[in-house]
Design a protein with these regions (language model features):
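Flexible, low-hydrophobicity surface segments
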Residues: 1-164
Length: 164
């Protein structure tokens, strides 16, 4: 694309198919035997995981597995994911685990994953997984996070400051 195209109108070629219901999306592609995944995610900004009860989800027809951190093989279970782009300016390297083990540090952190025959079964089963949390103090503002005595975003770190 040359400079002459910046700011110029571009005719959209995909609209007729999409507007008439003839468009194809990745979700329209059906692969026989494919399984679907849905993550169980933390509703809390900071909490300790007390327990995960997947019994109800596992009894649902079409559910193949509910995987938690304790089900993962080593080293995925005990080691955090590697820092892909190490930066010497970081005071402490803090990468997350594939699935939360003992603590969740942000809303939406994956706690478990449900594997099922369809997306909808996986979503329903994920909703049936019962996670008990011990909610910890959290801080949601950068200015508050660096104040003396502020709750730490990650319990295993000594500060909320990643780099100076």
């Amino acid at each position: 694309m040359g400079v002459k195209h910046f700011g110029a109108r571009v005719k959209r070629l995909e609209d007729p198919a999409l507007l008439t219901g003839r468009g194809r999306f990745v979700d329209d592609v059906k692969v026989p035997g494919v399984l679907h995944a849905c993550f169980v995610r933390s509703p809390y900004a900071h909490a300790r995981l007390q327990s995960i009860d997947a019994k109800a989800a596992m009894t649902m027809p079409g559910v193949h597995a509910v995987i938690t951190a304790s089900d993962l093989p080593e080293p995925m279970r005990s080691q955090p994911m590697p820092m892909l782009l190490p930066n010497p300016a970081l005071a402490a390297v803090c990468t997350q685990h594939v699935l939360a083990r003992d603590e969740v540090c942000y809303v939406g952190q994956a706690v478990a994953v449900v594997v099922a025959d369809t997306r909808y079964i996986a979503e329903d089963a994920a909703a049936a997984v019962i996670v008990n949390y011990d909610v910890l103090d959290a801080v949601g503002d950068c200015r508050d996070a660096i104040k003396e005595g502020a709750p730490r975003a990650h319990s295993d770190l000594t500060t909320n400051v990643a780099s100076t």
